[in-house]
Amino acid sequence: MVRPVAWPRPIPEGHSWRALVGDGWPAHVRVLHPASRRIDGVEHPVRWREIAPEGVSIATAGWSEVSGIGLHEGVTGPGWDHEPDVGPSPLILPVLLRQMLPGVPEGRVWIGEWDGWGGRKRPAGSRPLTVPGRRYHVAATSPRKLLTGLNPDRLPDVVWDEAGTFIIVADIDLPSTVVGCQKGIAERLLRCPGLEAVRVDGAAPVVT
């Protein structure tokens, strides 16, 4: 029998950001996935703050509040042609990992792949992990191997380090990536020019 790995923090009930990443993280960061605009056949990223109406806080707003159009409604809007990606974003996750992994103490990093992706074999050496609403195949790797071996067509849905300094959750239903982490890591993410990152209250309800 394959022994399951454990989520790094207890998962509380409810539909809060804390319920996604687990309880007890000192800081919670929401990294917004960009929309895009096509100019001369080339896709250019569009940040939420570029199109958000005056008075709308991108820290607490969902995509529909920012754009005026519901997620997955299949239409364009003023200033953008394609809505943000959901799940692991090839524009976001590599940047996040480059910000976080170099400071990780020696030890393993756990990566999890949602079991709902079609047409995929289970990752080699993975073990099952079930949390409320999701089931993952989780495998251990090193920070170096994860950084050098990223495949934009098959990014992990969850990543956390054995030392317990962070967890990254790129849920398939969300146009943002959620991070539970130490305060120093949160500050680094909020300052990163390659990310549109906002601090969120872990007890606040999840918005899409």
Question: Which residues does each PLM region occupy?
Answer:
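Extended, low-hydrophobicity segments enriched in charged/polar residues
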Residues: M1-T148
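Acidic-enriched, low-complexity/disordered segments with a strong bias for Aspartate over Glutamate
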Residues: D23, D40, D81, D85, ...
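N-terminal low-complexity, intrinsically disordered segments
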Residues: I58-L71, V75, R154-I168, A204-T208
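Aromatic-enriched hydrophobic runs in primary sequence
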Residues: W114-W117, F166, K183, L189
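Amphipathic protein-protein interaction modules
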Residues: L129-I185
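Alpha-helical oligomerization segments
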Residues: A170-T208
